[in-house]
Amino acid sequence: MKIKNLLITSLLVIISCVKIVLAEEKAISEHQYNFYTGNFDFSDDKQKAVLFGFQHQNENLVRDTFLGIASPVTGAFITENSAAYIYTGVEWNYSLGDKLNLTPSFTPGIYHEGNGKDLGHAIEFKTELQANYSISEGTNLGLSYNHLSNASLGVKNP
């Protein structure tokens, strides 16, 4: 049983470190769809959970700004404990060569606790830093880290 749990935990750690992004070519579609998986609150042994998410980006709304190439994003994730987060916000894309990109983002949203972690308020702000590598035209492999905070809107702000 311990070996099975160790294997499952190892697999989840590996999956949580990898974010696969599937995007259609611009000539085919103006929309980019990202599917991802990972760990929610990986540092809390009692509350950590596997999560699955989806994100949409409209290529027609991309703007070149003094902060980088800005793009609106909308998405959601759900955890194995039925906690869910729906968000919309902006991300900035910085190219670090032909194949490597760095993408910070800020996305306010609504959080539902479900049977998961109590974050203290329904309104949460997600900040994220993502690095991805272009494997081929329209396919990227990336790694990201994000943080949810209610900015002390609630009594509790873990």
Regions picked out by a protein language model, each given a short descriptive name:
Residues 40-50, 76-87, 96-98, 116-122, ...:
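Solvent-exposed loop/turn segments connecting transmembrane beta-strands
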Residues 23-30, 44-45, 60-70, 95-102, ...:
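Short loop/turn motifs that connect adjacent beta-strands in outer-membrane beta-barrel proteins
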Residues 26-28, 132-158:
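Predominantly the C-terminal beta-signal and adjacent terminal strand-loop region
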Residues 31-41, 67-79, 102-112, 144-149:
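Transmembrane beta-strand segments that form the barrel wall of outer-membrane beta-barrel proteins
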Residues 50-54, 70, 84-88, 125-129:
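Hydrophobic, lipid-facing positions within transmembrane beta-strands of outer-membrane proteins
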Residues 1-28:
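Cleavable N-terminal export/targeting peptides
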